[in-house]
Each structure stands twice: as C-alpha cells, then as structure tokens.
C-alpha cells in the first residue's frame, strides 16, 4: 500500500517556512563576524583601511599578521598562562564542587538548606558588584600579580558547577551508598569509587562551561594580573589597541590564534563533549 502524504494546512506551511528562514537568517548573522574576522586577519593594514570588511584579501597566504600578533603580544607566554590557570581552576572546581555537592546532597544537617540558598544568592549577584570587596581581600592576602592567587580566586567563584553536580546527584540512587556502607566502604571511598565516576557527564558539562569562561575571562585577569609576563590570552589581544586607534587586522589574527587551541580540543574530544552535555542536561 502506498503511504499517504501528510497533509499540511496553509498555516502550518507558513510556520515551517518561517522556522527555516529564521534558522538560516540567524545562522548567517552568527557566522558573519567569524567570516569577517578571518578575512581581516589576512589583510595588510593598507587593505584593511581602504576596503570593506567583507572584501576578500589580495593574498590568502599572507601570514605576516599572525607572526606579528604572536610575537608582539607574546601570545606563547600568554597561552601557557591561560592553560595553567584553566587546568588548575578546572581541577580545583571539580574536586571542591563534587565533594561539596556530595555532602549537601547525601547528608542532612542543620544549615544544609541555608548553605544552598546562600550559594544560589551568590550566583545571582553580578560579579562586577563584588569586585571592590574581592580586590581588597586579594590585596590583603598578597594575591595580586600572582597566578596562584588568581587561580584560587577563580576556583572560589564557581557556584554554577556546584549546582550542576547537586542536580545530577539527585538522580543517583541512595541505595548505592547504602550497599557500599554495608560492604564496609567509607564515605571517602563511596565518593571516590562510586560518585565521581557516575558524575562524569556532569563533570564534562561543568568543565566546558567553566573552561570557556576562564579562558575568555578579561575583566578579572586584567584587574589582578597586571604584569606583562602574567598576561593571559584574553588580555594579550588588547596589545593592539590604543588611544589613537586599533590595529584590527592584528587583533583578528590574534583572535584566530587564540581560538585554534580550543578548536583542536573540541575536535579531539567532541565524542565526549556530545555525550556529556545531553546526559548532564537530562539528569540535571
């Protein structure tokens, strides 16, 4: 038997067309800045000043901007600093966040709800509003212009990851804990051998959110890391800005250089990323 074609009303057809046109339009809008950045990165300074931003460069093999951006902005050192900060912050955030989530989720004690509400309240506060107090604390502790101080500060402001772990842990049966306790396992062993492996999807989600935020952080890095040898990738791009104008061809080249490591990580770990985010979202 021949299958009947599904009949659509005029309103449904209009709605389908509208959805796809909107999807194409907003995708195009999102891609334009990236295309413009790539085009500008290959232009000479004279080309950039005399042509439209979407005008193609005369020479696609002009890598002078990339070399100059890498050398003048000391992007090699900046990349190392960014990686050190990001890796340390992610490790600290995972250890602190998962342990705190385990305690708040599995143990009922006076003040449990209050602590959760305080974390929620802290998440709602804009980070800029707390910078005066945070800066004073950082200054008094001698953490200004020290990578370890900046790392500690960034680890201490990770509230969203804690809530991701708590919400995911809500779906892990308590019976697993009870069975492990009957078998003689300690709370630490339950956390290390049971909870942490089961939290892998949530950890992937938290690492992506936190990692992108730390790698792209400009305000805090510029405030607490003012020495030249401590600059991160986000700060190094502002080497080409000044009161008399900005060298956007070099800035765009620097942007592409800074994006390459993230792109490589995404390509290598895309399977884990695609499997981790949906699982973390569903469980959360």
Label the model's feature ranges.
Residues 6-11, 15-284:
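A structural signal for multi-pass alpha-helical bundles of membrane permease subunits
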